[in-house]
């Protein structure tokens, strides 16, 4: 399950979302996009993602987690291939919006499926390992895109989209063959239950006042993460090329380092949350992100950019890892999908706002530095909200 989950995350976020930043400079030049239009394309993705956040629980109930994942990956593969054919800004916007729909279906269903297979003692670590697939996707695109661009010239970004779509299609087939909705489908028990039977499904329906209080606070934290990490992820390569004069190949190597460090993100912060508490895991992750944004926001030289990229990568998947574990701990595995969808709504709203706001600010100021500084302020707000969480039931 972990191996299959890595492959799903490699495709639905690592390639579908995080290759966009690498392809954006060449794509923008070919389609003559302003910074604002670049931001709107990124926002379109998250509008699609946001739509799927609302529909994912119903879709999973109707089709099951495995079928939802396969459907999502299929949509991603098709729309990424169409992006490679796009000749205008509106068509690129529509295609990438539907890529977001597919990403939402696959990501949310995969995260909920993990909670079905792993007991609380291993849930944070297992989720972290699965999310490491995002980092593999970043490394893959960080090396593939510059090489394809060098070999194919100005239109290399189109071939890159096609190749990435093919990789997602292969992942779609493999996920359909390997994944199962729960351990009982294979006559197994929940991993980490130490020989005990999987706990029976909770009989609770809906959420209590205490549950809603927790969900609101987690939602605010997830919103700050959504706004900030996507600004950095969307525009850092553009910043390196346009503001620091790096070549596409050099910027690609920078981006690949994000992927490398992010391989440790989920496992490290998942372990911290399993060992100490979910609260400590969230606060530590937000603190690392704050440092990364400040280093990018001030002109401190190339060494500071390297450190910023390393810190960003190290904390890249930390918040989703701990969030899912927290939700599953507090609400139970059978309400985890609904709870995760609710807080992911906050996350998706943040991702809708982030690229648009940063793109418009860059058009006004000619730089993304103010966006990185504002991102640091928002993650500090997230730390303050994290401090209000109780340590009840591992949080």
Predicted features by range, described:
Residues 32, 64, 85-90, 245, ...:
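Helix-breaking motifs and short loop linkers at transmembrane-helix boundaries and internal kinks
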Residues 96-132:
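Cytoplasmic helix-loop-helix junction between adjacent transmembrane helices
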Residues 165-194, 385-389:
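C-terminal membrane-cytosol helix-exit motif in multi-pass small-molecule transporters
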Residues 262, 273-326:
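C-terminal transmembrane helical hairpin of 12-TM major facilitator-type secondary transporters
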């Amino acid at each position: 399950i972990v191996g299959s989950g890595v492959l799903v995350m490699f495709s639905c976020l690592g390639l579908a979302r995080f290759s966009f930043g690498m392809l954006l400079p060449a794509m923008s030049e070919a389609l003559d996009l302003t910074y604002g239009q670049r931001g709107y394309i990124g926002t379109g993705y998250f509008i699609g993602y946001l739509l799927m956040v609302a529909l994912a629980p119903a879709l999973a109930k109707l089709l099951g987690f495995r079928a939802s994942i396969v459907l999502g990956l299929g949509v991603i593969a098709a729309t990424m291939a169409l992006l490679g054919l796009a000749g205008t800004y509106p068509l690129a916007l529509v295609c990438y919006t539907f890529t977001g729909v597919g990403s939402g279906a696959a990501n949310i269903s995969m995260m909920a499926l993990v909670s079905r297979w792993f007991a609380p003692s291993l849930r944070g670590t297992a989720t972290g390992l699965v999310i490491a697939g995002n980092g593999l996707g970043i490394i893959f695109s960080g090396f593939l895109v510059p090489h394809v661009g060098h070999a194919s010239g100005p239109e290399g970004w189109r071939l890159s989209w096609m190749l990435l779509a093919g990789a997602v299609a292969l992942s779609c087939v493999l996920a359909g063959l390997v994944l199962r909705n729960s351990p009982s489908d294979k006559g197994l028990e929940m991993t980490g239950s130490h020989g005990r039977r999987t706990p029976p499904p909770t009989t609770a329906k809906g959420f209590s006042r205490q549950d809603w209080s927790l969900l609101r606070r987690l939602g605010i934290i997830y919103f700050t993460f959504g706004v900030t990490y996507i600004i950095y992820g969307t525009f850092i390569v553009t910043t390196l090329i346009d503001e620091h004069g790096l070549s596409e190949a050099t910027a690609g190597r920078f981006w690949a380092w994000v992927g490398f460090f992010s391989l440790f993100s989920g496992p490290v912060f998942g372990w911290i949350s399993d060992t100490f508490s979910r609260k400590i895991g969230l606060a530590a992750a937000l603190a690392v992100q704050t440092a990364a944004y400040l280093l990018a926001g001030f002109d401190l030289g190339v060494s500071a950019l390297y450190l910023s990229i390393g810190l960003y990568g190290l904390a890249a998947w930390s918040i989703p890892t701990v969030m899912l574990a927290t939700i599953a701990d507090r609400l139970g595995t059978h309400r985890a999908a609904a709870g995760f969808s609710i807080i992911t709504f906050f996350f998706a709203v943040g991702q809708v706002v982030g690229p648009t706001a940063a793109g418009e600010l860059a058009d006004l100021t000619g730089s993304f530095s103010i966006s990185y500084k504002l991102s640091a302020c928002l993650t500090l707000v997230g730390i303050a909200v994290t401090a209000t969480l109780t340590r009840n039931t591992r949080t």
